[in-house]
Amino acid sequence: MHPAPDMSLWQGRIDSQEGAGALRWHQWIRPYHESAGAASVLLGFASDEGVRRNQGRQGARQGPPALRRALANLAWHGEQALYDAGDIEAAEDLEGAQERYARRVAELLGRGHQVVGLGGGHEIAYASFSGLAHHLGRDGGTPRIGILNFDAHFDLRHAEQASSGTPFRQIAEHCEASGWPFAYCCLGVSRLSNTAALFDQAQRLGVRYLLDRQVQPWNLERSEAFLDSFLQSIEHLYLTVCLDVLPAAQAPGVSAPSAHGVEMSLVEHLVRRAKASGKLRLADIAELNPQFDNDQRTARIAARLVDALVN
């Protein structure tokens, strides 16, 4: 039995006098039902247990409802059906929640849906990838899955327990065990937020990355070419945005705010470029922490990125 979505979060302005073209997200979205045809589906991962284990600022568990509230009043410009499939709650059982989320993602992908995950800590990444891997690996082949992560951190840590700092290490181990290539691209990496040991680990694993100071307006063509080269090397794309890739002035509501970061305009541009490749299979937004947000600034940015992924 899957949890029902809280549709009371979807409230906003109604411009009935403007006609049928004046709809907003809260008027378009519907609660997910198992007989729904192919559509865009939002699935929340209400967890900050991984953040706690990673010694970060907790509060991301409230990210999914905050993101829905920020989405609710946005103008709707799409034509496809849109559903809310509710949240997978983690509490202290992170590993169990990741398994449940992965199974749900695989189910939804198997029904032809476009899934966008709403975090929650970045521990959502291992759950998302696991679901996509299960979906694509059913025929016993070797899918070339690319992971595109917008993030100030590699999240390749060694740890006894899974956390928000370990998901891509876990994915690398999953790929090694399955005999699959590990294709990981990280854009916006902060040199001062990752130790030399993590850079060495990234090199050993063949991670492609650009530093935050490289993903800048004056260097846009290089960033585009770097992304395009990665996209050409894969068949299926899993895209994840950790909101701490953005400058703290734009995204204060995260576990680890960035002193430098990558401007929102560039992140959105590159997200749209990745989506336009036609290889996007699954996406999520991670690390929204309403407890430290200011005037819903981070939630609004996250909502804009979700809209870019859906529409």
From Swiss-Prot:
GO terms for molecular function: agmatinase activity; formimidoylglutamase activity; manganese ion binding. Binds 2 manganese ions per subunit. It comes from the Bacteria. InterPro entries: HutG (IPR005923), Ureohydrolase (IPR006035), Ureohydrolase_dom_sf (IPR023696). Its EC number is 3.5.3.8. Signal peptide: none annotated. NCBIfam families: hutG. Catalyzes the conversion of N-formimidoyl-L-glutamate to L-glutamate and formamide. Belongs to the arginase family. This is Formimidoylglutamase. It comes from Pseudomonas paraeruginosa (strain DSM 24068 / PA7). The lineage of its organism: Bacteria, Pseudomonadati, Pseudomonadota, Gammaproteobacteria, Pseudomonadales.
